[in-house]
From Swiss-Prot:
Domain of life according to the entry: Eukaryota
Subunit-structure text: NDH is composed of at least 16 different subunits, 5 of which are encoded in the nucleus.
GO molecular-function term, one example from the UniProt record: NADH dehydrogenase (ubiquinone) activity
Reactions listed under catalytic activity: a plastoquinone + NADH + (n+1) H(+)(in) = a plastoquinol + NAD(+) + n H(+)(out); a plastoquinone + NADPH + (n+1) H(+)(in) = a plastoquinol + NADP(+) + n H(+)(out)
Location relative to the cell: Plastid, Chloroplast thylakoid membrane
Entry's Gene Ontology cellular component terms: chloroplast thylakoid membrane
A GO biological-process term: photosynthesis, light reaction
Keywords recorded for this protein, A-Z: Chloroplast, Membrane, NAD, NADP, Plastid, Plastoquinone, Quinone, Thylakoid, Translocase, Transmembrane, Transmembrane helix, Transport
Enzyme Commission numbers on file: 7.1.1.-
Natural source organism: Lolium perenne (Perennial ryegrass)
UniProt name for this protein: NAD(P)H-quinone oxidoreductase subunit 2 A, chloroplastic
Length: 510
């Protein structure tokens, strides 16, 4: 009898929860319409996979890419609408959040073509791979719009869990298994530290979880200068640091870059930084409004360490992916300058502009690495020697992307860094900008070292990998070259294209 009553109560409670969730989705679903498109794409992938055979694999790519493109279109149609807070305060829609969501969708759209030939050559499971990519994209989009502590924690966990699975997708590779284990342990530790910081923020504000309400709660409780807020700030900075991977929270990055499948590294190298930057900007700028001097100092230290250590350690690397891992650590130092500058001197606009260029530069470089790796089976920098003699298009594409990453004029990377450093200089960050300029010059050295190898024609320097280099006969080869071409063009855009990009970026500030 007691069991029967308990069972009825459980059914009633479950029904109430389901109805409440349905009610929220019914009346707030339009505010997450781009995310709903991705969810529909995920469901469609599962349905087709369960009812079809392996001959329908092109449909999987088509559905994934189409859902991403439609989601981007829906996001653009919603552009310049008034800011809206939905789902009982859990989610906020505004231009600032939407441009970061657009960047994440753009990354995913470009990464799927990079994966086609790699998946076919390595015989990986296609459906699960695309499901993880779309789910991680969904988690990143929700993180950009998250407006309360619970959503800010759950959304990156959705992204992180898919990232762990993707990094260990080649199960027979020992390096991949090692990278996944390190990534999982470091990610779990960082999430624990992040939640610890959230708990201090929650308690100090009198039990508030929405970002703006936390500020009001801190004013009411007079706890905005308390030691608890300092503990929360340090814990949250450390937790977010593992997501952004600046120095000294970068230990996992080189191993994960080297051990994970190259298309996965391309995806993680940009989407994780875009989503974490959006989240860090909102968390630090809103709840820690009264501690701006403290978190500015913390970020300045992280930026200096990242720019110096990242670029110095990149010089000594022999693996192309490890070199790009340390390069990305230096690049996040430049992005942090924009976060520190903030809204007052176009800091956010410069950060967004540089991130847009960084996406094209980085993905273009990884597209070249994927193509070279599939045709030669090597990742060693020395094995790129003489590539220009065998494949001029691939060698020139890689050279242009690397030069743009280094910030050489008149490439896009130069103008992105110029605007970012100029905003930092106007904000009085003279020392930080000086370090950024010096480390940018340093980065040019190891990029030019690779380009010199690409263009060499001396037989004694050319390895057997390039001597036996053959173009892949696979038809899907065109999809990688398409993504590569798009990224190379975007990386080499002259400065005349900066004005419309800056105007859009400046219009996204919240």
């Amino acid at each position: 009898m007691i069991w029967h009553v308990q069972n009825e109560n459980f059914i009633l409670d479950s029904t109430r929860i389901f109805m409440k969730a349905f009610h929220l989705l019914l009346f707030n679903g339009s505010f997450i319409f781009p995310e709903c498109i991705l969810i529909f794409g995920l469901i469609l992938l599962l349905m087709i996979d369960s009812t079809s055979d392996q001959k329908d694999r092109p449909w999987f790519y088509f559905i994934s890419s189409t859902s991403l493109v439609i989601s981007i279109t829906a996001l653009l149609f919603r552009w310049r609408e008034e800011p809206i807070i939905s789902f009982s305060g859990n989610f906020q829609t505004n231009n600032f959040n939407e441009i970061f969501q657009f960047l994440i969708l753009l990354c995913s759209t470009l990464c799927i073509p990079l994966s086609v030939e790699y998946i076919e050559c390595t015989e990986m499971a296609i459906t699960e791979f695309l499901l993880f990519i779309l789910t991680a994209t969904l988690g990143g989009m929700f993180l950009c719009g998250a407006n309360d502590l619970i959503t800010i924690f759950v959304a990156p966990e959705c992204f992180s869990l898919c990232s762990y699975l993707l990094s260990g997708y080649t199960k027979r590779d020992l390096r991949s298994n090692e990278a996944t284990m390190k990534y999982l342990l470091m990610g779990g530790a960082s999430s624990s530290i992040l939640v610890h910081g959230f708990s201090w923020l929650y308690g100090s504000s009198g039990g508030e979880i929405e970002l703006q309400e936390i500020v009001n709660g801190l004013i009411n409780t007079q706890m905005y200068n308390s030691p608890g807020i300092s503990i929360a700030l340090i814990s949250i900075t450390v937790g977010l640091g593992f997501k952004l991977s600046p120095a000294p929270f970068h230990q996992w990055t080189p191993d994960v870059y080297e051990g994970s499948p190259t298309p996965v590294v391309a995806f993680l190298s940009v989407t994780s930084k875009v989503a974490a930057s959006a989240s860090a900007t909102r968390i630090l700028d809103i709840p820690f409004y009264f501690s701006s001097n403290e978190w500015h100092l913390l970020l300045e230290i992280l930026a200096i360490l990242s720019m110096i250590l990242g670029n110095l350690l990149a010089i000594t690397q022999t693996s192309m992916k490890r070199m790009l891992a340390y390069s990305s650590i230096g690049q996040i130092g430049y992005v942090i300058i924009g976060i520190i500058v903030g809204d007052s001197n176009d800091g956010y606009a410069s950060m967004i502009t540089y991130m847009l260029f960084y996406i094209s530069m980085n993905l273009g470089t990884f597209a070249c690495i994927v193509l070279f790796g599939l045709r030669t089976g090597t990742d060693n920098i020395r094995d790129y020697a003489g590539l220009y003699t065998k494949d001029p298009f691939l060698a020139l594409s890689l050279a242009l992307c690397l030069l743009s990453l280094g910030g050489l004029p008149p490439l896009a990377g130069f103008f992105g860094k110029l605007y970012l450093f100029w905003c930092g200089w106007q904000a009085g960050l003279y020392f930080l900008v000086s370090i950024g300029l010096l480390t940018s010059v340093l980065s040019i050295y190891y990029y030019l070292k690779i380009i010199k190898l690409l263009m060499t024609g001396r037989n004694q320097e050319i390895t057997p990998y390039v001597r036996n280099y053959r173009r892949s006969p696979l038809r899907s080869n065109n999809s990688i070259e398409l993504s590569m071409t798009v990224c190379v063009i975007a990386s080499t855009l002259p400065g005349i294209s900066m004005n419309p990009i800056l105007a859009i970026a400046q219009d996204t500030l919240f």
